[in-house]
């Protein structure tokens, strides 16, 4: 058994509404707003696509999701040979880490970011440098200072989970200019569809100038397919060819591929979802207490407080399950009535 596994624990999902009702003695409905899921669900066209292909369940999937790869290739205008799929971005991160890292290698990322970068590096006996956040966001200059000849991967999350903060196109461009070209920079844009900032990076454009800039995206968030597990990376052909050796043969299911294609085709529905999210997100920042909130470009708001357990409990008492952190609470933006209840709590909470 790998000794480094003793440094880790298995991922612990939030408690279910039923478990929380029992633990806290709550009656009435509880709304799960802890995992940044799209509360509006997927496009109706996804449900139609799933139903129309149920008779194919006894077939193995087509390895590599060729139909979905071609659909993304056409929509984003990238060569299909540069796209690799995983069962969610969790598996993509695992495959990249397994393919790239050897014992003693080093990854650089941030504190208070998505935990799978750290987790998979430790599994591969790599060292992890976590640079503290600066004003709630990635300290890109601080990360540059940590690069040395042991650095094998750099992980960025934009917008960052759990803070919702982002760095701009110019900031990313200047960062990439200073990173040695042989070090892959993985840019996780799981929440990109929710972004409204005009200066958010055009990472696909930056890839034209930086061969080591690799982009990760998912169907779990804005497209509402978290339960079907479809994520992907757009990288150089050489990198994809190597990483594909690690990919399990049938990792993305047949139904998941059909569902993702249907979701991708319904851009009008995606636009409706992201506009609703933007409107509801803005409501949180219209109250004076928003001085305690980190600015978000995602479908969640991070509330800073030294009394995070008390805030979590207060939100739970109005029927909303959120995500507890030592220095705050992350609130997934819900339906209007759910958000209104949470905003009332936030207005009267003592931070």
From Swiss-Prot:
GO molecular function: histidinol-phosphate transaminase activity; pyridoxal phosphate binding
Record keywords, A-Z: Amino-acid biosynthesis, Aminotransferase, Histidine biosynthesis, Pyridoxal phosphate, Transferase
InterPro entries: Aminotrans_II_pyridoxalP_BS, Aminotransferase_I/II_large, HisP_aminotrans, HistidinolP_aminotransfase, PyrdxlP-dep_Trfase, PyrdxlP-dep_Trfase_major, PyrdxlP-dep_Trfase_small
Entry-linked SUPFAM superfamilies: PLP-dependent transferases
Entries under CDD domains matching the protein: AAT_like (cd00609)
EC number(s) reported in the record: 2.6.1.9
Reaction catalysis annotation: L-histidinol phosphate + 2-oxoglutarate = 3-(imidazol-4-yl)-2-oxopropyl phosphate + L-glutamate
Pathway: Amino-acid biosynthesis; L-histidine biosynthesis; L-histidine from 5-phospho-alpha-D-ribose 1-diphosphate: step 7/9
BP term (GO), one: L-histidine biosynthetic process
Cofactor(s) essential for the protein: pyridoxal 5'-phosphate
N6-(pyridoxal phosphate)lysine sites (modified residues): 221
Segment forming the signal sequence: none
Subunit structure: Homodimer.
The protein, known as: Histidinol-phosphate aminotransferase
């Amino acid at each position: 058994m790998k000794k480094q596994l003793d440094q880790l624990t298995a991922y612990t999902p939030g408690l279910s509404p039923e478990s929380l009702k029992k633990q806290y003695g709550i009656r009435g409905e509880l709304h799960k707003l802890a995992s940044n899921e799209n509360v509006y669900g997927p496009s109706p066209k996804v449900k139609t696509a799933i139903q129309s292909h149920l008779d194919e369940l006894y077939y193995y999937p087509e390895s590599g999701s060729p139909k979905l790869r071609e659909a993304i290739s056409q929509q984003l205008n990238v060569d299909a040979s540069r796209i690799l799929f995983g069962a969610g971005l969790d598996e993509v991160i695992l495959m990249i880490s397994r393919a790239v890292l050897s014992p003693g290698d080093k990854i650089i990322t941030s504190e208070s970011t998505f935990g799978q970068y750290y987790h998979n590096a430790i599994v591969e006996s790599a060292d992890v440098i976590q640079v503290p956040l600066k004003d709630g966001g990635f300290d890109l200059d601080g990360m540059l200072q940590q690069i040395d000849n042991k650095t094998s991967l750099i992980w960025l999350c934009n917008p960052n989970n759990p803070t919702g903060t982002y760095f701009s196109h110019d900031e990313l461009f200047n960062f990439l200019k200073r990173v040695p070209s042989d070090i892959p920079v993985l840019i996780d844009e799981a929440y990109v569809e929710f972004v409204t900032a005009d200066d958010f990076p055009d990472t696909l454009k930056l890839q034209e100038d930086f061969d080591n800039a690799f982009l990760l995206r998912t169907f779990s968030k804005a497209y509402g397919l978290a339960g079907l597990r479809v994520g992907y990376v757009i990288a150089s052909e050489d990198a994809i060819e190597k990483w594909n050796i690690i990919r399990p043969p049938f990792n993305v299911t047949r139904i998941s591929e059909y569902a993702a294609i249907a979701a991708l085709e319904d851009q009008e529905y995606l636009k409706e979802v992201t506009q609703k999210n933007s409107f509801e997100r803005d409501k949180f920042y219209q109250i004076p207490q928003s001085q305690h909130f980190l600015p978000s470009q995602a479908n969640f708001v991070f509330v800073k407080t030294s009394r995070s357990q008390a805030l979590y409990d207060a939100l739970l008492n109005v029927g909303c399950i959120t995500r507890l952190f030592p220095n705050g609470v992350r609130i997934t933006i819900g339906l209007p009535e759910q958000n209104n209840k949470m905003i009332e709590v936030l207005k009267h909470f003592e931070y």
